[in-house]
Amino acid sequence: MIDQAIAAPLAAALTAKGYETLTAVQQAVLAPEAQGRDVLVSAQTGSGKTVAFGIAIADQILAGQDKLLYADSPLALVIAPTRELALQVARELEWLYASAGAQIATCVGGMDYRSEKRALDRGAHIVVGTPGRLRDHIDRKSLDLSGLRAAVLDEADEMLRMGFIDDVERILQETPDSRQTALFSATMPSAIKRIAK
């Protein structure tokens, strides 16, 4: 039985995908003390963390609605260390948020910049991308994060290891202080804990 605390569109998507129970990391983000708050989660690849952060940010994105309206600027941002992971995350969020009508844009190196800009201009609710390409869109004024409600840092320890932390911090400076932050990392180095604050 899927938890009653999950937003209805997401619960329907999980049920349609055959989910009967949630993983430990997915249950953790539903805990009352985690609702609407910043979360720092130690999670390995394969633990169901993409669905977990999709659930964690749902209240911020949906704001009590079952369907999303047009968004002038993104409501949620997911930063991932690699193009492959970003594309995988986008695919997962697409089915999870499909019945809510979420428009998801992917911004990653090696892809056509103009296509990404068009997707952003059409009103993306969720943007998934890599640090360098996201920063490029910010610098070119094609990505406005002023209305962001939630930010997710996926595999934050990998971003640290790959030297992306300065880009991540610069991206987060463009977002409102009131945003919810969900940070997922297999390990928790001190630099990761600093970003979480």
Which residues fall in each region the model found?
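Conserved pre-motif I regulatory segment
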Residues: M1-S42, D154
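Conserved nucleic-acid-binding Ia/Ib motif block in the N-terminal RecA-like helicase ATPase lobe
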Residues: D3, P9-A12, Y19, L69-D139, ...
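Walker A/P-loop NTP-binding motif
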Residues: Q27-V39, T50-Y70, L87, E92-L96, ...
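Short hydrophobic/aromatic beta-strand immediately N-terminal to the Walker A/P-loop
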Residues: L40-S42, L77, A182
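The conserved Walker
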Residues: A43-S47
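Hydrophobic beta-strand core positions in alpha/beta domains
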Residues: G54, V78-A80, V128, R161, ...
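Post-DEXD/H (motif II) to motif III coupling segment of the RecA-like Helicase ATP-binding lobe
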Residues: D144-K197
